[in-house]
């Protein structure tokens, strides 16, 4: 088919001139939180499982190895008392989980979004696109539509709802938002990741150690970003530039890490091979992303690594020969919030830029120019996002 010059110029006129940039970041968590040291006692008490003495001790050891101090959660003891099937290991409880999360996930997303919009400082009427991600509360119309109403956005905002993605999806959201911002001149994309462990909270079972790992690891939280190209001088101040973004998965990786939505909630399967498998496959992703830039020293980058668990962080650090300061922000977020699934790496991104400003660094990326965001999850899917910092 022949393409006329005028037609081609028209297509290019619809594209932004510059690369996508993160213009603001906001985060939010539920008010209720649990202390990790005392959580084994709490968990076995609220699930009426105190008779499982040996299993409780095993859970205590698992919790102590997570390097988590506290986690925020929607599920309070009062809510669990009112909905006892949530405390069972196998009783059907999906309807109750849905009722809770369909309401709470958009509200949590709203809190983070309002913080991002406030930092951005521009009218919310100029938001053109919304990308919402959660593994919780699948519904139609979805959390994206509910958030538009909660924020009072235009009904004409272009929406994309991503359900059931998992821990890698923080990187996915940046990749999708980059494409939207760069291919739609003047676009301002609101990205929201809101997650809750309530979808998978279950009582313990001696036959299911994987469940104990999930109960020790996941927390609740939401992160929101405003992303756009060609920032308005004097009105918009970029935080990071999204230089490139790519996705891949490890062949046969789904046998190592998978989650399944069942009548008893979201079930979790994880093998001991997850940390070494991720660590072994990360460097090939880095080489593909940074070889064109002439970079092979991974310590020359600032790092946002999704903390799937402490063992993963340790093995990636060891395999790549990273200095102890490189994954400090990752460990801080894991310690203070637990694994927040898709929102987690965005919390770390926020931590990096705040720490850089607090410590008087030259740039928003620990004083360095280039960095990498790596997120991974079911599949084993890996997202690799190259970021450029901005001067502070």
Curated annotation (Swiss-Prot):
Expressed at low level in seedlings after illumination with UV light. No expression in flowers or tissue culture. It catalyses: (E)-4-coumaroyl-CoA + 3 malonyl-CoA + 3 H(+) = 2',4,4',6'-tetrahydroxychalcone + 3 CO2 + 4 CoA. Keywords: Acyltransferase, Flavonoid biosynthesis, Transferase. Its EC number is 2.3.1.74. It comes from the Eukaryota. The primary product of this enzyme is 4,2',4',6'-tetrahydroxychalcone (also termed naringenin-chalcone or chalcone) which can under specific conditions spontaneously isomerize into naringenin. This is Chalcone synthase B. It comes from Petunia hybrida (Petunia). The gene is CHSB.
């Amino acid at each position: 088919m022949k393409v006329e010059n005028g037609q081609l110029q028209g297509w290019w006129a619809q594209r932004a001139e510059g690369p996508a940039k993160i213009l603001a970041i906001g985060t939010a968590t539920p008010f209720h939180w649990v202390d990790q040291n005392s959580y084994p006692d709490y968990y076995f008490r609220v699930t009426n499982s105190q008779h499982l003495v040996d299993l409780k001790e095993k859970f205590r050891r698992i919790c102590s190895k997570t390097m988590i101090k506290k986690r925020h959660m929607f599920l309070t003891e009062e809510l669990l008392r009112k909905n006892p099937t949530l405390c069972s290991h196998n009783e059907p409880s999906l309807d109750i989980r849905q009722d809770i999360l369909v309401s709470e996930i958009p509200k949590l997303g709203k809190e983070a979004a309002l913080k991002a919009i406030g930092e951005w400082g521009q009218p919310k009427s100029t938001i053109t696109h919304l990308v919402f991600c959660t593994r919780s509360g699948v519904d139609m119309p979805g959390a994206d539509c509910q958030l538009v109403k909660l924020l009072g956005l235009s009904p004409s905002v272009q929406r994309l709802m991503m359900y059931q993605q998992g821990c890698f999806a923080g990187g996915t959201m940046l990749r999708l938002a980059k494409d939207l911002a760069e291919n739609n001149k003047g676009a301002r994309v609101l990205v929201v990741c809101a997650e809750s462990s309530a979808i998978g909270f279950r009582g313990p079972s001696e036959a299911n150690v994987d469940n104990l790992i999930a109960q020790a690891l996941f927390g609740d939280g939401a992160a929101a970003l405003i992303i756009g190209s060609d920032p308005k001088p004097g009105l918009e101040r970029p935080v990071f530039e999204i230089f490139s973004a790519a996705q891949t998965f490890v062949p046969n990786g789904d046998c190592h890490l998978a989650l399944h939505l069942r009548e008893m909630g979201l079930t979790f399967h994880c093998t001991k091979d997850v940390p070494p498998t991720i660590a072994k496959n990360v460097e090939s992703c880095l080489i593909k992303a940074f070889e064109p830039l002439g970079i092979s020293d991974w310590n020359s980058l600032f790092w946002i690594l999704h903390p799937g668990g402490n063992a993963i962080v340790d093995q990636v650090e060891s395999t790549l020969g990273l200095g102890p300061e490189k994954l400090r922000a990752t460990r801080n977020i894991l310690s203070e919030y637990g694994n927040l699934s898709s929102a987690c790496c965005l919390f770390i991104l926020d931590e990096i830029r705040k720490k850089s400003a607090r410590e008087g660094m030259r740039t928003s990326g620990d004083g360095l120019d280039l960095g990498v965001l790596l997120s991974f999850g079911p599949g084993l899917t890996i997202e690799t996002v190259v970021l450029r910092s901005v001067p502070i």
